[in-house]
């Protein structure tokens, strides 16, 4: 440990700590622009200057490592004068257009100029002006405001892993740019907006829409993937204005994927705002009483075993639990969250989770991707993997091509024989698995989305057992889930085995839109959802429900952590919350569902399933070796790129996401997208 004195206070810090970090530990506020705790140190804004005894000049505290016996002063006339001088230089070419800047009210430059600036300006010459750069449909630039802190450049290189930002020219003429002025290729590019300390990079969809003090903030969870990223929904009235990340060190740190951040405008379009009943082949509007009575009458006329319910990718745990309880009351035990027919083993919780945990990736030293594409399925999780690779602490190999990652990766091939050889210790990569202290295997839908998924999964379990990848001190087997509802559905047993879809007489769809509807031609379809997607067009009765921003709900992320998405705005039109709809349908059938409100549902959930008594936490889970007698096919393993920006009913109806798709297609046609070409190591 190193001892130093800061403003008369003696503190101890570990070796390698910077003076800035030591000052922060001592409770001192040091102004800064270029420094960011998750980025490499640049030391180019000079706003963090402090006085060090025996030094003739003030030092940049963010770049100076501590030394024994250092005496630091953070509030002397020298420091005050230095900060005023730095701020004056930073504002020399700044346009000072705060009234029309989207960053106004939440701008570091604005706040620090007020606190540390001189209040007067000696510069009377003409200011420089820089042409705004094009960075795609998500980021709006005003580069004249840029103070060259280089945070965006370091984020692109160190976190996103795509070196597409940089600086050109020197001195006063320096410009931050994306070189070719093309759409940024990263799936987490929107984070550059958050870390920009001025108004140079702003959200294009949010531009000129609102001020910070007009907005109501609601804590929620990102539901467009299975990561469970913590988000903050900013709303004005009953309109969602923007979505920002919340800090959670165990999941998303402070980053957020572009889909979770920008797809909120899809909540405005193609919404179901009133019940509909199909009459004479056409859907016509109806009252709630009429729609619920029609469903109740239909249920009474059908044998319970001929009724099946499917939950969609955005269904909350409470909604699925309420629907399951309702179905059991009418004698039906057919319900499933797995509308994609993924071949997963759900007999033990550890068999379908990301057992290493997201934060646990920081400990892994070898990663084997099998049919997995984490860049598009879990972009924030992927940034953790990339950071470890670039730090030289993790090696990544993959079985299954068809995608490109943002870090160095070793291609082992795509033949199923590779897995068989690994299981028998006959492949050269086996030596690396044996040598690794903390190896992990990540299995994607390129495996469990196949018809022979169970057979491949059985083979992977043999590899896990062979190389001791799941043990008391290390959990290295991981399933990479695609959808927010899957783990929660599995946790409450909403995954009963199904018979032939052709035999179903009534299908109750809880936001399910990805079913093989050609097999449900003879079924009476009830669709409970919030968007007019495929399921709604096939339905005989539509019950309009609330989106995730319009009702409170629990979602369990891929590592098995239950979290609550709070209600931010009211449902549109005559739409109702999911549990209210199911409760009214139960009342129509004169059923006692034993629960009448959200709190009662959560209390019952916690009693029946211990995981829901630990909101925000991960519990220990059992893992059991899985074996299958299914035969392997001869098809190679692939993990093809997907339409990342459109994977659910909200993102599919987002104008912003549509613009992203168009921009990516244009880049791909020009051969500029990293997703359109493969790199091999």
Curated annotation (Swiss-Prot):
[4Fe-4S] cluster 2 binds at residues 146, 149, 152, 196. It catalyses: a quinone + NADH + 5 H(+)(in) = a quinol + NAD(+) + 4 H(+)(out). Residues 1-78 form the 2Fe-2S ferredoxin-type domain. Coiled coil: none annotated. This is NADH-quinone oxidoreductase subunit G. Belongs to the complex I 75 kDa subunit family. The keyword Transport does not apply. NDH-1 shuttles electrons from NADH, via FMN and iron-sulfur (Fe-S) centers, to quinones in the respiratory chain. Couples the redox reaction to proton translocation (for every two electrons transferred, four hydrogen ions are translocated across the cytoplasmic membrane), and thus conserves the redox energy in a proton gradient. It comes from Rickettsia bellii (strain RML369-C). One of its GO terms (cellular component) is membrane. [4Fe-4S] cluster 1 binds at residues 94, 98, 101, 107. The keyword Translocase applies. Its cofactor is [2Fe-2S] cluster; [4Fe-4S] cluster. GO terms for molecular function: 2 iron, 2 sulfur cluster binding; 4 iron, 4 sulfur cluster binding; metal ion binding; NADH dehydrogenase (ubiquinone) activity; quinone binding. Binds 1 [2Fe-2S] cluster per subunit. The gene is nuoG. One of its GO terms (biological process) is ATP synthesis coupled electron transport.
């Amino acid at each position: 440990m190193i001892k130093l004195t800061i403003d008369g206070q003696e503190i101890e810090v570990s070796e390698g700590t910077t003076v800035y970090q030591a000052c922060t530990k001592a409770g001192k506020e040091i102004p800064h622009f270029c420094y960011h705790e998750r980025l490499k140190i640049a030391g180019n804004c000079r706003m963090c200057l402090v006085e060090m005894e025996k030094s003739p000049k003030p030092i940049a505290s963010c770049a100076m490592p501590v030394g024994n016996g250092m005496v630091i002063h953070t509030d002397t006339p020298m420091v005050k004068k230095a900060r005023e001088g730095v701020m004056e230089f930073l504002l020399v070419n700044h346009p000072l257009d705060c009234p029309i800047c989207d960053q106004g009210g939440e701008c570091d430059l604005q706040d620090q100029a007020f606190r540390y600036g001189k209040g007067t300006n000696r510069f009377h010459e003409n200011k420089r002006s820089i042409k705004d750069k094009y960075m795609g449909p998500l980021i709006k630039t005003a580069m004249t405001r840029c103070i060259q802190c280089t945070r965006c450049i370091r984020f692109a290189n160190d976190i996103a892993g795509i070196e597409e930002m940089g600086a050109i020219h020197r001195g006063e003429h320096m410009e931050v740019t994306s070189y070719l002025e093309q759409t940024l290729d990263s799936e987490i590019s929107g984070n550059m907006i958050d870390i920009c300390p001025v108004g140079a990079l702003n959200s294009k969809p949010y531009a000129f829409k609102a001020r910070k003090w007009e907005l109501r903030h609601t804590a929620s969870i990102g539901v467009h993937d299975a990561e469970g990223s913590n988000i903050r929904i900013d709303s004005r009235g009953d309109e969602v204005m923007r979505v920002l990340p919340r800090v959670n060190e165990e999941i998303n740190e402070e980053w957020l994927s572009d889909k979770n951040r920008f797809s909120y405008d899809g909540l405005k379009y193609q919404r179901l705002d009133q019940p509909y009943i199909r009459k004479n082949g056409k859907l016509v509007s109806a009252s709630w009483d009429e729609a619920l009575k029609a469903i109740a009458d239909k249920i009474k006329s059908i044998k319970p075993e001929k009724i099946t319910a499917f939950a969609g990718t955005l269904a909350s745990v409470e909604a699925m639990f309420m629907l399951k309880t309702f179905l059991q009351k009418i004698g039906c035990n057919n319900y499933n969250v797995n509308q994609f027919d993924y071949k997963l083993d759900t007999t033990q919780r550890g068999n379908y989770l990301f057992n290493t945990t997201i934060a646990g990736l920081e400990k892994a030293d070898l990663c084997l991707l099998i049919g997995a594409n984490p860049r598009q399925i879990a972009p924030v999780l992927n940034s953790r993997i990339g950071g470890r690779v670039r730090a030289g602490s993790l090696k990544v190999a993959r079985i299954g091509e068809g995608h490109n990652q943002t870090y160095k990766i070793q291609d082992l091939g795509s033949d199923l024989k590779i897995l068989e050889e690994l299981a028998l210790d006959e492949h050269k990569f086996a030596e690396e698995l044996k040598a690794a202290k903390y190896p992990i295997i990540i299995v994607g839908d390129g495996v469990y989305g196949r018809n022979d998924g169970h057979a491949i999964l059985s083979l992977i379990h043999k590899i896990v057992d062979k190389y001791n990848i799941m043990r008391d001190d290390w959990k290295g087997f991981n399933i990479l889930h695609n959808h927010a509802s899957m783990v929660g559905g599995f946790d409450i047993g909403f995954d009963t085995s199904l018979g032939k879809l052709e035999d179903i007489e009534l299908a109750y769809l809880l936001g399910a839109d990805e079913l093989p509807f050609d097999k449900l031609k003879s079924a009476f379809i009830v669709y409970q959802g919030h968007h007019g997607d495929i399921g709604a067009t096939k339905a005989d009765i539509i019950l309009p429900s609330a989106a995730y921003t319009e009702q409170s709900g629990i979602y369990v992320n891929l590592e098995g952590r239950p979290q609550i998405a709070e209600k931010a705005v009211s449902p549109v039109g005559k739409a109702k919350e999911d549990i209210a709809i199911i409760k009214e349908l139960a009342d129509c059938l004169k059923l006692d569902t034993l629960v009448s409100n959200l709190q009662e549902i959560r209390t019952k959930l916690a009693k029946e399933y211990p995981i829901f008594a630990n909101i925000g936490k991960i519990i220990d889970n059992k893992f059991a070796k899985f074996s299958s007698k299914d035969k392997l096919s001869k098809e190679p393993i692939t993990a093809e790129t997907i339409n990342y920006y459109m994977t659910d009913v909200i993102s599919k109806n987002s104008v912003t996401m549509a613009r992203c798709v168009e921009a990516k297609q244009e880049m791909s046609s020009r051969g500029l997208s990293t997703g359109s070409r493969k790199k091999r190591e």
